Amino acid sequence: MLSFSGFSYRRQQERDRKEIKHMKNRLHVKAPGNWVNDPNGMIYYKGQYHLFYQHFPYAPRWGTMHWGHAVSRDLVHWEHLGVALFPSKDEDQNGCFSGSAVEENGVMHLFYTGVHYNQVNPKDIHQCLDQDFTSAQLHLTSKD
């Protein structure tokens, strides 16, 4: 153990770890549960910050991507609004992946990558066979 004038390096490391954990729990947005992946589409819209993120809401493992949605007025306190995007059409039936958000004339526009597996892996429905998939850039709008 390294010590300088009664100062314990190991004790300071432990204090630092606790402080980092405390700050991380306060300042890092976490989904209410299950798998969380890349943040997408951070935007300030109608008086709130909106954060979208890739999310598999059914298990704590990677799966067919959805977009979770959280809002904040101060970037510290977040309210989770649930799933914002979910696979709902042929072009994104196997996941809603990375994208962005922009505002134009009071309307929020979400752009994202939809994925469709041409051959699904029979051992894991969340994977395609032999990288055989198509992707499409998709767009939707919201006024609320």
Positions of predicted regions on the chain:
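Beta-rich carbohydrate-recognition and catalytic domains
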Residues: 2-144
